[in-house]
UniProtKB/Swiss-Prot annotation:
Coiled-coil annotated spans: none
GO cellular component terms listed in the entry, alphabetical order: cytoplasm
Cross-referenced Gene3D superfamilies: 3.90.660.10, FAD/NAD(P)-binding domain
Catalytic activities: spermine + O2 + H2O = 3-aminopropanal + spermidine + H2O2; spermidine + O2 + H2O = 3-aminopropanal + putrescine + H2O2; N(1)-acetylspermine + O2 + H2O = 3-acetamidopropanal + spermidine + H2O2; N(1)-acetylspermidine + O2 + H2O = 3-acetamidopropanal + putrescine + H2O2
Pfam families associated with the record: Amino_oxidase
Function of the molecule: Involved in the production of beta-alanine, a precursor of pantothenic acid. Multicopy suppressor of fenpropimorph resistance.
Keyword list, A-Z: FAD, Flavoprotein, Oxidoreductase
Annotated organism of origin: Saccharomyces cerevisiae (strain ATCC 204508 / S288c)
Cofactor(s) listed: FAD
UniProt protein name: Polyamine oxidase FMS1
Length: 508
């Protein structure tokens, strides 16, 4: 039996991601003393993580961009700091996309295909589908694209029917989900300005982490339970046996980890036991929101020997002329669905690098680094992260798509330079030196990337439940607790500031 008196704190913050760090920073700025940030990992930053690769190159293996830069307060703060000290903290890397098909090669800006124009119509079709009438049932993004093709086939060429669906799927790389898992209602969303590529997020994390007393931070400390006492205080129990008592608690763990608290299995890493349990409105909200698995693979080359025409390249999933025939011949949407299901069931092919779209950021153009940063979605992310240490297997999997990209960028096939082989005298040929893979689906304290919607989900329920808190003293912050900036670093940052400001006002 633990007879040690709990250490008393004003506010305890659980999680040292950007939401938790900003909450601590805001509390300190507002004059609140004696707070504590408990972090299960041995580092700060959460899903912001900068890693070092070949020749000391740095990459963000978690979030990479400041999105919505017209309205993003974290970006505007960074921009002001750059004005003050002249340091480059980001680059705007928006660009015209290069789209590559395995058979046809480049299909972007094609005078006959005009895929970008038809894709724009597809986004308008989605908007009209769900916003012209109230109560329209949700479906998967895949089903919505099929509906568009069926209704508009009279006005589409065979090649447009073949390639457009695969081009539309680049949106999978925003959400971290396959189009058959993704809510059609939630697929398209407005962007408030351009995207700025961070150089790098570790400087943002360290700046915020150093803006409050360092003795507030306790790393490698997993929280096991949170109990609301009759005295109105909150008791926090940690895995290492330490016990704390606080006036307020801000919980910033990811939605995927918080979800463990409503599962019957109690011995899961990261799971927090709540006493009393999370209130019904929070438990119910988990039924209306899910989690995506956006993963990253970094391909590091000796030097850049490819065209820097664009910083953005998407390779399209394979398509067939048989698909076009099915779309042309289907009597209605139900028949189209069943015909496509039948065709799928007859294919017993294993997953390849051409089974889904992939998004490559050509860092050579945007930052001068001879590397590609590739984004992938579930379920591919789960598979690739499970073999992340086997670099030869990774290279073998992605080699066909890398070679195709190099060909389209006026270069040669990729040479495997990861093994110490003598005499790689390959002037002006792309020599691959290293592969780095993210680990978010296998990390027990992230269990994926960020919140995402399956068909029928409604993220508003979770945001409302989280922003109202468990009660007046047990509060929540993180990207899943806010509407503006949901799924983004700045949304998490803003939610941490929101909760800390609220508590500061109550304590004054």
């Amino acid at each position: 039996m633990n007879t040690v008196s709990p250490a008393k704190k004003k506010v305890i913050i659980i999680g040292a991601g950007i939401a938790g760090l900003k909450a601590a920073s805001t509390l300190h700025q507002n004059g609140i003393q004696d707070c504590l940030v408990l972090e299960a990992r041995d580092r700060v930053g959460g899903r912001l993580q900068t890693v070092t690769g070949y020749q000391g190159r740095k990459y963000d293996i978690g979030a990479s961009w400041h999105h919505d830069t017209l309205t993003n307060p974290l970006f505007l703060e960074e921009a002001q700091l750059s004005l003050n000290d002249g340091r480059t903290r980001f680059v705007f890397d928006d660009d015209n996309f290069i789209y590559i098909d395995e058979e046809r090669g480049r299909v972007d800006h094609d005078k006959e295909l005009l895929l970008e124009i038809v894709d724009n119509e597809m986004s308008k079709f989605a908007e009209l589908e769900f916003h012209q009438h109230l109560g329209v049932s949700d479906c998967s993004f895949f089903q919505l694209v099929m509906k568009y093709l069926l209704q508009r086939r009279q006005f589409l060429t065979n090649d447009q029917i073949r390639y457009l669906p695969q081009l539309c799927r680049y949106l999978e790389l925003w959400h971290g989900l396959d189009w058959k898992l993704l809510s059609a209602k939630d697929t398209y969303f407005g962007h408030q300005g351009r995207n700025a590529f961070a150089l790098n997020y570790d400087s943002v994390v360290q700046r915020i982490a150093q803006s409050f007393p360092q003795n507030w931070l306790k790393l490698s400390c997993e929280v096991k339970s949170i109990t609301r006492e009759p005295s109105k205080n909150v008791t926090v129990n940690c895995e290492d046996g330490t016990v704390y008592n606080a006036d307020y608690v801000i919980i910033t763990v990811p939605q995927s980890v918080l979800n463990l608290s409503v599962q019957p299995e109690k011995n899961l890493r990261g799971r927090i036991e709540f006493q009393p349990p999370l209130k019904p409105v929070i438990q119910d909200a988990f039924d209306k929101i899910h989690f995506g698995a956006l993963g990253k693979v970094i391909f590091e080359f000796e030097e850049c020997c490819w065209s820097n025409e664009s910083s953005k390249i998407v390779t399209l999933a394979n398509s067939t002329n048989e698909f076009v025939e099915i779309v042309r011949n289907a009597e209605n949407l139900d028949e189209l669905d069943s015909m496509l299901e039948r065709e799928d069931s007859q294919k017993h092919t294993s997953v390849t690098c051409w089974s889904q779209p992939l998004f490559f950021v050509n860092l050579s153009k945007s930052t001068g680094v001879a590397s590609f940063m590739m984004l992938m979605q579930a379920p591919l992310t789960n598979h690739i992260e499970s073999i992340r240490e086997d670099k030869e297997r990774l290279f073998s999997f992605f080699q066909p798509v890398l070679n195709k990209i190099m060909k389209c960028l006026d270069s040669e096939d990729v040479i495997d330079g990861m093994r110490p082989i003598e005499n790689i005298a390959n002037a002006n040929k792309p020599v691959l030196r290293n592969i780095i893979v993210s680990n978010w689906t296998r990390d027990p304290y992230s269990r994926g990337a960020y919140s995402a919607c399956f068909p029928g989900d409604d993220p508003v329920d979770m945001v409302v439940a989280m922003s109202n808190g468990q009660d007046s003293r047990i509060r929540f912050a993180g990207e899943h607790t806010i509407m503006d900036g949901a799924g983004c670093a700045y949304g998490a940052w803003e939610s941490g500031r929101r909760e800390a400001t609220r508590i500061s006002d109550l304590l004054k």
